[in-house]
């Protein structure tokens, strides 16, 4: 990194379950640990995007303890003490907080910068992405700054949250490449009609879940807006590096508030300019959150209506299907717009437009205690 910014660390959030990618995504091998798009896993791709920016000693991963061994196998370059395990999932505020207190204690990193990044997103323009990450870290080095990357919308999407830039900000000029804009507000996932208005206004961006700030700035705001979680994390911090750490983590972590960093900190901070400065940098990086099998189809299809297959498959008089068949031969005849995914013990068949509902299958399996399929 440039000498103009403090030491910077990448925090990869890799603790999700990926239930919408059942039956391939399971508790011990969730979406981020699978090669769903490309030959390498989502986690490996994320790590490789970051290595030109951060040395291995400055990359951290937060994951569930059941996934820690698989993470270690995939990222052998990352020091084992940098793979932070959650005893139970408590959403992104807790996960980021755990990383922050480890930086504070292990690296004496109160002034260090954190780049918080999901493990399971697709980015089609990695060079531009790295340039924007550098700009975001530079902006985050300013006192009190909380910086978010926003994706310029390419369609009226109802599945993402939106970020509205402040009205007084002028449209970005070529000389202002990668500039940070003040945020007016964070908007919930909208209706289709409202999403169309957002896109037409030119002021709204998709919230991509990528965040940048100083450790000290984050912890100050966490104490202000989520004081109980902050206090519990500081109790955990006191035990880092001691024989009592595991017990403290187990005891305290399950009591942390189960809330996203957006709701917990960023949204209230954007309404509180007296205490915080919240900014967004537009990032046209060919991004997808790869949120369902339908998103995988969109990324892999070479043209509208094409069939996409991984593994051994045949499509006859068929169109728009995604077939994932790593072991069995699958033939699809006279069908359209389906997702077909087989594993050794399960088969999923659903329409592409209902791919978001695959998570309901996992809920049903949980209710019926079919643990072998989870």
Give residue spans per PLM region:
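Conserved N-terminal catalytic core of the sugar/cofactor nucleotidyltransferase
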Residues: 1-12, 20-30, 35-134, 151, ...
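Left-handed beta-helix
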Residues: 1-7, 215-374
């Amino acid at each position: 990194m440039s000498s103009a910014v403090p030491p910077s660390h990448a925090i990869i959030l890799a603790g999700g379950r990926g239930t919408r990618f059942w039956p391939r995504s399971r508790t011990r091998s969730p979406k981020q640990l699978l090669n769903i798009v490309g030959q390498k896993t989502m986690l490996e791709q994320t790590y490789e995007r970051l290595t030109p920016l951060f040395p291995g000693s400055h990359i951290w991963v937060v994951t569930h303890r059941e996934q820690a061994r698989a993470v270690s196998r995939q990222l052998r370059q990352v020091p084992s003490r940098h793979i932070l395990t959650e005893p139970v999932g408590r959403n992104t505020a807790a996960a980021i907080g755990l990383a922050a207190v480890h930086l504070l204690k292990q690296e004496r990193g109160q002034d260090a910068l954190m780049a918080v990044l999901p493990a399971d997103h697709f980015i089609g323009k990695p060079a531009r992405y790295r340039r924007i990450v550098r700009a975001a870290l530079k902006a985050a080095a300013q006192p009190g700054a909380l910086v978010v990357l926003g994706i310029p919308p390419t369609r009226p999407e109802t599945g993402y949250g939106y970020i509205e830039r402040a009205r007084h900000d002028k449209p970005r000029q070529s000389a202002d490449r990668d500039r940070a804009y003040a945020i007016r507000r964070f908007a919930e996932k909208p209706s289709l009609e409202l999403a169309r208005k957002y896109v037409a206004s030119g002021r709204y961006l998709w919230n991509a879940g990528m965040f940048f700030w100083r450790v000290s700035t984050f912890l100050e705001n966490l104490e202000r807006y989520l004081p109980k979680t902050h206090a519990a994390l500081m109790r955990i911090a006191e035990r880092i590096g001691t024989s009592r750490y595991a017990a403290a983590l187990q005891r305290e972590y399950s009591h942390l508030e189960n809330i996203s960093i957006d709701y917990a900190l960023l949204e209230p901070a954007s309404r509180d300019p007296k205490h915080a400065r919240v900014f967004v940098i537009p990032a046209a990086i060919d991004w997808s959150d790869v949120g369902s099998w339908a998103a995988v189809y969109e990324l892999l299809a070479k043209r509208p209506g094409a069939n996409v297959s991984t593994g051994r498959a045949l499509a006859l008089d068929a169109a728009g299907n995604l077939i994932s068949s790593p072991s069995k031969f699958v033939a699809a005849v006279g069908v359209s717009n389906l997702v077909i995914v087989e594993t050794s013990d399960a088969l999923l068949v659903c329409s592409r437009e209902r791919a978001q509902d695959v998570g309901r299958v996992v809920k049903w399996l949980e209710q019926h205690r079919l643990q072998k399929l989870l």
